[in-house]
A protein has these predicted regions:
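Carbohydrate transferase catalytic cores enriched for Leloir-type hexosyltransferases
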Residues: 1-405
């Protein structure tokens, strides 16, 4: 068995990134337990992975600034790179991997720790290259964030034995921006988070409890996303104003997600245009509550500028909730005719779409069926089989030159 270390530096409240890594760990363990031994390496003592009652062996790695800088220099400083065999500080990350007899490391996102590996092969997930596409958003380009993101990808993507992403359109961009061979980039589609994927039976009492807990309105559109400029919350608030004033539809909006310093501005804007009573701001929501927030809504709306793929549409397909999604970056190649496409610059397009779906039950029914069919058409085992293919390919090549003592 190959010993795979899954490296985690993602917080639970990071939304889709955390849900995706949990799903990946669960599927890899379920499908390839006999061929891959999984251990977790985390830089946080608070992050304990417990999936379906199973706890994974977890090792804690915390590197201070000096230790990280040393690891970086060992790889990228020309002088240190030549001298490190003879004298220099050791690489704390590599030392731990050698101690644990790790064969391969999997980074579930673009982690700076991927730049610190010297001798251990690794796989990395790159969910998007939005910082190269939308330079106007501060969270991607200001305060040196663009340079930080681009440095990680430019140094790690070409060095990884494989890159995993979520759509062919992203694969093409990774190859173009970072000169990665397309044969080394694998596409594994998003899937619903485990809480939604495992949801089976609607419980009325639980639903009422959640309505009371969050003081939910009777009719609302749902947008689960961190509070960041590129998520386009302002657009949804404008849509609610149009729905209520132009179309006389008594509909609210429910947001949920972690605040990244932008929430107060969104709240202030909702007050300025007299929509405060129609906008409900929730924090990060626990997994068991999430399905009910979908099921009690009129629709999922995602006027985002990022991705272009995201997890919530797949969750809505599973729960048979209509999806409104930004018509950006050739996203139609991914979601096909399973979502109602909207112009993320024009709130009226979302307002008109919501009215159209509410008033046209047949159109809504067709949309729900197509979304659920698309979700069910994806061969999950085949897609995740690519991961085992990567592991076996690496082992096959190593067997041509490696001698077992």
């Amino acid at each position: 068995r190959e010993k795979l270390a899954i490296f985690l530096d993602t917080q639970k409240n990071s939304g889709g990134a955390y849900q995706e890594l949990i799903y990946m760990i669960d599927r890899l363990d379920s499908l390839y337990k006999g061929e891959i031994e999984i251990v977790i390496i985390s830089n946080s003592t608070d992050l304990q992975i417990n999936i379906k009652g199973k706890k994974f062996t977890t090792y804690y790695l915390r590197m201070n600034f000096f230790e990280r800088h040393i690891a970086f220099l060992r790889n990228y400083d020309p002088t240190i790179r030549r001298l490190k065999k003879y004298f220099f500080f050791k690489n704390k990350f590599e030392n731990l991997l050698k101690k644990l007899n790790i064969d391969l490391v999997y980074f579930t996102g673009p982690s700076q720790y991927s730049m610190y590996l010297e001798d251990t092969d690794f796989i990395i997930t790159i969910p998007d290259v939005s910082h190269r596409e939308n330079l106007e958003f501060p969270e991607w380009t200001k305060s040196s964030e663009f340079l930080r993101r681009d440095e990680i990808l430019s140094k790690s993507a070409v060095k990884a034995i494989a890159v995993i992403t979520n759509a062919r359109i992203i694969k093409e961009k990774i190859s173009s921006f970072y000169s990665v061979e397309k044969d080394r980039i694998y596409v594994i589609n998003h899937r619903p988070s485990i809480g939604v994927a495992n949801f089976e039976n609607f419980d009325s009492s639980t639903s009422e409890k959640i309505k009371t807990k969050y003081n939910l309105p009777k009719k609302y559109i749902f947008y689960p996303a961190m509070y960041l400029p590129h998520k386009n919350h302002k657009y949804v608030i404008d849509t609610i104003k149009i729905l209520n004033e132009k179309f006389n539809k008594d509909i609210s909006a429910v947001f949920c997600g972690s605040d990244k310093g932008y929430l107060n501005k969104i709240k202030k804007y909702s007050e300025e245009i007299n929509q405060k009573k129609k906008i409900f701001f929730l924090d990060f929501v626990e997994d068991e509550y999430l399905p009910y927030l979908y099921l009690n809504s009129q629709a999922l709306v995602m006027p985002t500028f990022s991705g272009p793929t995201n997890i919530p549409p797949w969750e809505a397909f599973k729960l048979k909730i209509p999806v409104f999604y930004s018509d950006i970056h050739n996203i139609r190649n991914v979601y096909k005719d399973c979502v109602y496409y909207i112009d993320p610059f024009n709130p009226a397009s979302l307002a008109e779409g919501i009215v159209d779906i509410i008033d046209n039950k047949q159109k809504k029914s067709n949309l729900l069926k197509k979304g659920n069919d698309l979700l069910n058409s994806i061969d999950e085992n085949k897609e995740f089989g690519q991961f085992l293919e990567i592991v076996k390919k690496r082992r096959k090549i190593k067997d041509t030159w490696e001698f077992k003592n």
